[in-house]
């Protein structure tokens, strides 16, 4: 048999990518590079795969993360060797916490070119450490190893990911040459061992893991007599709606994190929990049932800790499909690893009757007071602030999706917004400010639904070049950047006053008009709330593509207004 290493490299990649496609991969994110040629060309040649490109591997990883969030399917990423691989670490760390399925296909130099001074060669094996669920270090393509081995090895890694989510790393060392005009037919005899697989459509091998929760560790009789609270963390709309039905059946209060995409009569809890009257009522709770994870509100997390610390494990229940620990304060807890919708259905909602239904009804009036005060603040004046943007969000979303950034904005949304039946996306695993724009781009590419993104100025600066991902976007989208000239979140934290500006907030003095122009995006900088509302609505009703709306506010304004509002609220609830 004649040998052509470039062709053999592509034969291996053709087999690998076809198996990924059969396993549910539809999207492949590709960065430029020569060493990744076998993967890139075979991905392009596979009609089952849709390719997305970006010149920045760090942004590419977050683009894949957004695609995986929105599609709920595994997404592959192809990069060349060297630091290109290292740039995938931030998105990989996030997926390790939030369980989106990424498949990292990293091209590498062959082993004899590592640790010997060869160009663009770093130690890539194990580079993602514990942030990936599994790592498969492939040998360089050779006819001495069968394609049957390649398929079963890939399938084994995919089976682990299918069960627990997260990322898997497949490192692919390709010897040169990387380019050839010869046909794969020259390796027909070598590929004959998988001819049956090639002529079919199924995966080569499959692994099915049994459901470990055959009987639920908690029965309705254990909670029907309780004064319970239901907490909704990061969920999709279907899960959140089902969990709300459970709380309604029992007559229990439900606290909806903005990541759940729904609201309840007990909205704005982060604010009214400052009231002693409200806390006295809430502290009657003797049972907490949490669906999902990663609650934004620090006050709610503190209340869970103080309340559940005296509970036994059967009084604090967390239901989540995530097998990883969801217990940041190490409380007595029962974690039920289950599909949320299925678990709620198994509780037989029509037969449930809570013995203390309505026990938290007085808190509804308190929540309504907060909402009325918040709405009054924006209706009595036309001032455009971070707080007014958060309050207005409830009206602005309509049937649009939301991507909310980290730091100050997600906290203001948690406090002041009332999101109802909207799909909400965020990066609240590691809660970094890097890659937010790229992640939102992935969401838009996957869903192609109108979307509003709320992001801070420092976060946008961090991921500015990912605006290139929206240059050719036609789906109506508005990126709202609140520009307070630095990290305003530090106005809410007890950082040293003397070093607050220089070491924490780091004022930059930039605006984003020219950034929008560089990436061919629409741009507006409204000066009033009414102007902001009009601009956003006009874009969604008449336009297409991406509009960058810059809301310029003075430094420290958000913290000052929030403190004033909290003082007014405490007085009103006294």
UniProtKB/Swiss-Prot annotation:
Family to which this protein belongs: Belongs to the TPP enzyme family. MenD subfamily.
Cofactor: how and how many bound: Binds 1 thiamine pyrophosphate per subunit.
Molecular functions (GO terms): 2-succinyl-5-enolpyruvyl-6-hydroxy-3-cyclohexene-1-carboxylic-acid synthase activity; magnesium ion binding; manganese ion binding; thiamine pyrophosphate binding
Protein role: Catalyzes the thiamine diphosphate-dependent decarboxylation of 2-oxoglutarate and the subsequent addition of the resulting succinic semialdehyde-thiamine pyrophosphate anion to isochorismate to yield 2-succinyl-5-enolpyruvyl-6-hydroxy-3-cyclohexene-1-carboxylate (SEPHCHC).
Organism expressing this protein natively: Vibrio atlanticus (strain LGP32) (Vibrio splendidus (strain Mel32))
GO BP, sorted A to Z: menaquinone biosynthetic process
Keywords, alphabetical: Magnesium, Manganese, Menaquinone biosynthesis, Metal-binding, Thiamine pyrophosphate, Transferase
Cofactor: Mg(2+); Mn(2+); thiamine diphosphate
Classification via HAMAP family: MenD
EC annotation from Swiss-Prot or TrEMBL: 2.2.1.9
Pathway this chain belongs to: Quinol/quinone metabolism; 1,4-dihydroxy-2-naphthoate biosynthesis; 1,4-dihydroxy-2-naphthoate from chorismate: step 2/7; Quinol/quinone metabolism; menaquinone biosynthesis
UniProt KW NAD keyword: no
Reactions catalysed, as given in the entry: isochorismate + 2-oxoglutarate + H(+) = 5-enolpyruvoyl-6-hydroxy-2-succinyl-cyclohex-3-ene-1-carboxylate + CO2
Domain of life of the organism encoding this protein: Bacteria
Main enzyme class: transferase
Assembly with partners or alone: Homodimer.
Protein's name in the database: 2-succinyl-5-enolpyruvyl-6-hydroxy-3-cyclohexene-1-carboxylate synthase
């Amino acid at each position: 048999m004649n040998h052509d290493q470039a062709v053999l490299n592509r034969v291996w990649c053709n087999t690998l990518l076809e198996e990924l496609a059969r396993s549910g991969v539809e999207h492949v994110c590709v960065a430029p590079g020569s060493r990744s040629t076998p993967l890139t060309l075979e991905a392009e040649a596979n009609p089952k795969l849709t390719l997305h490109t970006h010149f920045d591997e760090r942004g590419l990883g977050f683009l894949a993360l957004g695609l995986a969030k929105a599609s709920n399917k595994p997404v592959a990423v192809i990069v060349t060797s060297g630091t290109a691989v290292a740039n995938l670490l931030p998105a990989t760390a996030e997926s390790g916490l939030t369980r989106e399925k990424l498949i990292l296909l990293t091209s590498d130099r062959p082993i004899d070119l590592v640790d010997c001074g060869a160009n663009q060669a770093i130690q890539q094996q194990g580079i993602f450490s514990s942030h990936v669920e599994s790592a498969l270090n492939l040998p360089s393509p050779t006819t001495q190893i069968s394609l049957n081995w390649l398929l079963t090895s890939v399938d084994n890694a995919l089976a682990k990911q299918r069960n627990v989510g997260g990322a898997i790393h497949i490192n692919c060392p390709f010897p040169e040459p990387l380019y050839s005009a010869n046909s794969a037919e020259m390796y027909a005899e070598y590929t004959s061992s998988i001819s049956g697989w090639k002529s079919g459509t199924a995966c080569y091998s499959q692994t099915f893991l049994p459901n470990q929760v055959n009987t639920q560790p908690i029965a309705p009789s254990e909670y029907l007599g309780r004064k319970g609270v239901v907490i909704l963390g990061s969920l999709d709309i279907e899960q959140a709606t089902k969990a709300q039905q459970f709380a309604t059946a029992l007559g229990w209060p439900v606290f909806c994190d903005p990541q759940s995409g729904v609201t309840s009569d007990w909205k704005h809890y982060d604010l009214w929990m400052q009231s002693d009257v409200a806390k006295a009522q809430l502290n009657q709770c003797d049972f907490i049932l949490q669906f999902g994870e990663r609650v934004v509100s620090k006050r709610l997390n503190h209340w869970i800790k103080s309340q559940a610390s005296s509970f036994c494990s059967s009084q604090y229940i967390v239901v989540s499909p995530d097998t990883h620990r969801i217990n940041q304060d190490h409380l007595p807890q029962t974690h039920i690893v289950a599909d949320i919708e299925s678990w709620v259905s198994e509780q037989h909602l029509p037969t449930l009757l809570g013995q203390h239904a309505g026990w938290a009804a007085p808190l509804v009036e308190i929540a309504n007071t907060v909402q009325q005060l918040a709405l009054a603040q924006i209706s009595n004046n036309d001032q455009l602030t971070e707080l007014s943007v958060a309050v207005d969000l409830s009206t602005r979303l309509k049937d649009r999706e939301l991507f909310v950034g980290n730091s100050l904005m997600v906290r203001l949304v948690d406090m002041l917004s009332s999101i109802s039946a909207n799909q909400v996306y965020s990066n609240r695993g590691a809660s970094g400010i890097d890659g937010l724009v790229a992640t939102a781009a992935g969401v838009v590419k996957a869903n192609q639904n109108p979307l509003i993104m709320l992001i801070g100025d420092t976060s946008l600066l961090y991921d500015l070049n990912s605006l290139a991902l929206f240059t050719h976007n036609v789906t109506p989208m508005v990126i709202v950047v609140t520009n307070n000239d630095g990290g305003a979140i530090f106005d809410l934290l007890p950082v040293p006053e003397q070093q607050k500006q220089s070491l924490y907030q780091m004022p930059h003095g930039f605006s984003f008009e020219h950034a929008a122009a560089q990436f061919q995006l629409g741009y507006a900088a409204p000066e009033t709330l009414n102007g902001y509302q009009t601009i956003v609505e006009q874009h969604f009703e008449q336009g297409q593509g991406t509009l960058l709306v810059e809301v310029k506010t003075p430094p420290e304004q958000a913290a000052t207004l929030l403190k004033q509002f909290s003082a007014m609220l405490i007085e009103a609830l006294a």
